[in-house]
Amino acid sequence: MDLARVLAQYDAEVRASPKAPPGLVVERADGVVCLTGYFNFISWWELTPSTVRQAVASHAAHFRSRGEKLMWRVYEHDSPAEISGCLAEEGFEPDAAGTLMIFDLANEVLATTGNVDIRRVKTEEHLEDFVKASEQAFGERDTWQRTAYSDRLNDPDLALYVAYVSAEIAASARLEIGSARSFGLLFGGGVAPSYRRLGIYRALVAERAREARRRDLLYLSTDARETSKPILQNLGFVSAAKEVTWVLNPS
């Protein structure tokens, strides 16, 4: 895999031209691409050292006036170099660092083992299990997911999964199809504490890889935390870029 080429393709297709699912809108202003709705997330920008400070200040003021949280994700290859400093000056705080990881679907998807039952979410009942699994894994209420996905259970560009162990909810995960249909985007994968170290995270990644292959996608991508990175590397993912998500909380 030509990692530099694939990373440039990811930037162009996923970050600069994001697909807005129901409930989100893509807004472009001042050289910045922002998804707004049930969350607010800046995915891309074309700024210079002379324009970055004003653009950051403008977006910070806008979302503060609305009393809404704003996330701005910066990768190590992004420019201008001043952007992280400008975000800090405007009151953004860095979340835990992560790594963009990419898997070439031309490679073999590793088999998984373990007594885990992975089911695709097709009904409202299973969506409730999906939300519960996320809440158990991350210890936070995730009611936004119910709103975001209840009308998308038959969306061909979305696949939600719940993992069960002995009929008990253990984990959940999500696959989204990028706008140019080259990338499958992996989200979630959180496992409830009592079911960790059983290979469930790995099984959910493998299941989504198989689904992505069935849809003739080229790559999988995910923003991984340090705890997930070794598992993904073992499955064949390659580290593409370090990242930090800067968060502006309403005050």
Language model feature labels by segment:
Residues 1-66, 79, 142-144:
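N-terminal charged segments
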Residues 52-60, 188-193, 197-210, 230, ...:
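Conserved acetyl-CoA-binding loop-helix of GNAT-fold acetyltransferases
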Residues 19-24, 67-68, 79, 95-98, ...:
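A short helix-loop-beta-strand connector motif used in the catalytic cores of GNAT acetyltransferases and
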Residues 123-136:
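A short, well-structured alpha-helix characteristic of acyl/acetyltransferase catalytic modules
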Residues 50-126, 222, 228, 244-249:
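Acyl-donor-binding surface of acyltransferase catalytic domains
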Residues 25-28, 76, 82-93, 159-173:
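Conserved beta-hairpin
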Residues 34-43, 95, 177-187, 196:
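A conserved beta-turn-beta hairpin within the catalytic core of GNAT-like acetyltransferases
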Residues 141-193:
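A conserved beta-strand-loop-helix scaffold within acyl/acetyltransferase catalytic domains
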